[in-house]
Amino acid sequence: MAKRDYYEILGVSKNATKEEIKKAYRKLSKKYHPDVNKEPDAAEKFKEIKEAYEVLSDDQKRAHYDQFGQADPNQGFGGFRSDDFDLGGFSGFGGFEDIFNTFFGGGRRRNPNAPRAGADLQYTMTLTFEEAAFGKETDIEIPSEETCNTCHGTGAKPGTKPETCPHCHGAGQISTEQSTPFGRIVNRRTCPYCGGTGQYIKEKCTTCGGTGRVKRRKKIHVKIPAGIDDGQQLRVAGQGERGLTVGRREIYILSFMWSRMSFLNVTAMIFIAKCRLRLRKLRLGMKSKSRPFTGKLKLKIPAGTQTGTRLRLKGKGVPNVRGYGYGDQHVIVRVVTPTKLTEKQKQLLREFDQLGGSSMHHEPHDRFFDKVKKAFKPES
């Protein structure tokens, strides 16, 4: 079954910018994240979205994809290789193998016994706003394929060892001859008995079933840096899967941030809080205390401050994930609507409204109480 187009998966055009691709990825990955979306196909969609983003967010991979699609251009004509044929029957045409190497991908068949690196692992971590802002140390468990401790990766039962495959005699390939009008052609294919390794395991390890690998859940300790952004990827070197006779690969931790604090919003390193004050305090000015995630901070409210005004506290925001400096905190002022007024208070407000003020000239069509209602209208 052919894979869907990566641009179609993310819902962006082929001319989309990296920022548009990143925005679409964040939106879709949150929607289909298995921890949030309980639909049966959510995990598969999430994997599909991640794969599309990994390609389209990388300039080199994206250019390759735009040119060749999802097929590997190095495969030539359906993976046809010169190694599959012995052209020895054409003794008078010594250059034919070179020609086939040129046109059909060339290259020798990969040695199945050659060292192979393990796989990179990915772990998705959900963070609260506080954890993303201040960092977090925690233990995580990841599924991983590791070397079997019973046979030490040989796949053979302890006390025995792999033998030379009796079918291919250790070559890893089986040859069949075919006569044609053009001469003799020898077709080589991977030995189905040993899988191309050239070795035959007569008594397999009962722990790993002869594969030399076992699946385990591995616990590792990770440190999430303060100031990590939503959707940012953290690399943990040397903790991925162990390869065959080579070292470990990496783990990539993908962060998703879910704020439990309804009055907070974060953009990059900017921290935004809402400060609710009574009407008289805004009219006359005051010193207030903002309650951000770092604790109480003193804040000077100028006289005549309007609801919706944003006040900046420099260096009181989220730490920089790279370890230097802090962002700014922005406090948005909101007026607290009085719910119960005495007759005297109502009369004073009417008198205040009749007196007017300089602000009335900027909005001649809004009465005072209309402004108050507008100021306290719930935000959508």
From Swiss-Prot:
Residues 5-69 form the J domain. Zn(2+) 2 binds at C165, C168, C191, C194. SUPFAM superfamilies: Chaperone J-domain, DnaJ/Hsp40 cysteine-rich domain, HSP40/DnaJ peptide-binding domain. InterPro entries: DnaJ, DnaJ_C, DnaJ_domain, DnaJ_domain_CS, HSP40/DnaJ_pept-bd, HSP_DnaJ_Cys-rich_dom, HSP_DnaJ_Cys-rich_dom_sf, J_dom_sf. Binds 2 Zn(2+) ions per monomer. A zinc finger (CR-type) spans 135-217. This is Chaperone protein DnaJ. It comes from Geobacillus stearothermophilus. The gene is dnaJ.
